[in-house]
């Protein structure tokens, strides 16, 4: 995904020194401070095994628990959105858009810049891609980072927003 590419850019820039480092070590105060979330690493977020618990911009992670997608390792054991006991971070795979969006939120805080800017500078411009693409966030996903107001963008398009890019 675009977020995996940007995580690679962060590794290359030295912003992520070790994908096994807990996210909270560099980014306290953005949703990784609880006893359950504190052990979550960049690798867990990227591999969708974080089991991150919380709400992001008013959407709780529970809405995507037990979500079924074609390529998942095994069938969901409940109905989408039902409560499910959380496992230890890194021990359970589940596709969850809120958790993907939390990865995006964390990367934005790590770069201290809007991700569309970083994506253009590090990915699309260097490869000569068209600038006719958009990465749109949700209306309520505005935050202030270092005195600059910026929009956190989603990693997917499940609830609108996301990346629109031409393949030509």
PLM feature segments, named:
Residues 6, 35, 56-58:
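Short, conserved acidic/polar surface loops in the N-terminal third of protein domains
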Residues 1-5, 21, 40-43, 97-101, ...:
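A structural signal for well-ordered alpha-helical segments within the folded catalytic domains
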Residues 6-7, 119:
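Active-site-flanking alpha-helical
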Residues 1, 56-140, 156, 162-163:
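Catalytic-site signature segments of enzymes, centered on catalytic residues
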Residues 13-53, 82, 109-161:
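Active-site helix/loop module of the DD-peptidase/beta-lactamase fold
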């Amino acid at each position: 995904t675009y977020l995996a590419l940007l995580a690679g850019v962060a590794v290359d820039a030295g912003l992520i020194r070790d994908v096994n480092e807990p996210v909270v070590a560099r980014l306290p105060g953005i949703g990784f401070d609880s006893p359950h979330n504190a052990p979550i690493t960049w690798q867990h977020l990227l591999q969708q095994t974080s089991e991150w618990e919380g709400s992001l911009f008013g959407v709780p992670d529970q809405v995507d628990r037990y979500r079924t997608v074609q390529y998942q390792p095994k069938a969901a054991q409940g109905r989408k959105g039902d409560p499910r006991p959380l496992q230890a971070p890194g021990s359970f795979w589940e596709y969850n858009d809120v958790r993907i969006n939390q990865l995006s939120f964390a990367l934005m805080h790590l770069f201290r810049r809007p991700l569309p800017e970083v994506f253009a500078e590090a990915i699309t411009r260097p490869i000569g891609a068209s600038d006719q693409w958009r990465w749109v966030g949700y209306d309520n996903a505005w935050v202030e980072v270092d005195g600059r107001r910026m929009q956190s963008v989603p990693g997917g398009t499940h609830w609108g927003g996301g990346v629109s890019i031409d393949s030509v």
